Regions:
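C-terminal motif of bacterial Sec signal peptides marking the signal peptidase cleavage site
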Residues: 13-16
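A short alpha-helix/helix-coil micro-patch that ends at or immediately precedes a cysteine
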Residues: 44-108
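Bacterial peptidoglycan biogenesis and beta-lactam-recognition machinery
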Residues: 77, 111, 159-161
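Post-signal peptide N-terminal segment of mature Sec-exported envelope proteins
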Residues: 24-51
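Bacterial N-terminal signal peptides that target proteins for export
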Residues: 1-7
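Disulfide-stabilized extracellular recognition modules
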Residues: 43-45, 132, 140-195
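Bacterial signal peptide processing site
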Residues: 18-21
């Protein structure tokens, strides 16, 4: 049995995530900030995550597709019905931030929204050049497929709320696989935003 883990800031809960996988999940948090003026040049910042495994990119794209299918259908998050929401569009800056965080978690063997160097999701997103008014992040580990990761997030009230939030318009997904030397092997980050 694979151990799937999906965490956002808050108290730990244990829940079944479908597909024979179990997950540990936390409550979700969204952050809001005034839209920043100007554009941050982020090409050098994102250099280490531009070239990516084709298989990993396919997984990331599948997550976007699955999330948009869930948004189009509407969903129940923690017993509360969420109406259908507009499709999210891929944002390469958010993908850069998500990839950097998944890579950091896998290579440095940790699982948290806070990076190994103390960075926050907000700092990664800004460093990648995304000026936002609202952002949210879902992370997961141990899920071996995009479907399992999305199912795990949808089974968590906070993660589901992030996915179904109609105010969020953009998504970047980062997937990183490290078979040996990491705790969970599969690491996922979803960074959502609105400008």
């Amino acid at each position: 049995m694979n151990l799937g883990v999906s965490v956002l800031l808050g108290a730990v809960l244990v829940a079944g995530c479908g597909g024979g996988e179990e997950g540990v999940i936390d409550e979700s948090v969204q952050m809001e900030a005034p839209a920043q003026e100007g554009t941050v040049t982020a090409l050098a910042y994102c250099d280490d995550v531009i070239t990516w495994s084709t298989g990993w990119t396919d997984f990331e794209n599948q997550v976007l597709t699955l999330v948009n299918q869930r948004r189009a259908a509407g969903a129940t998050c923690g017993g509360v019905y969420k109406a259908p929401a507009p499709a999210l569009t891929l944002d390469t800056r958010l993908r850069c931030a998500a990839r950097k965080h998944s890579k950091d978690m896998a290579l440095n063997t940790f699982f948290s929204h806070t990076g190994s160097n103390g960075s926050t999701p907000l700092q990664l997103i800004i460093s990648a050049g995304y000026a936002f008014s609202t952002e949210a992040e879902n992370i997961g580990a141990g899920y071996s497929t995009p479907s399992a990761a999305v199912t795990g997030w949808m089974n968590s009230t906070g993660h589901c709320n992030n996915i179904m939030n109609p105010s969020l318009r953009h998504l970047g997904v980062g997937y990183y696989y490290r078979a040996s030397g990491s705790t969970y092997a599969h690491y996922w980050t979803q960074d959502f935003g609105a400008q």
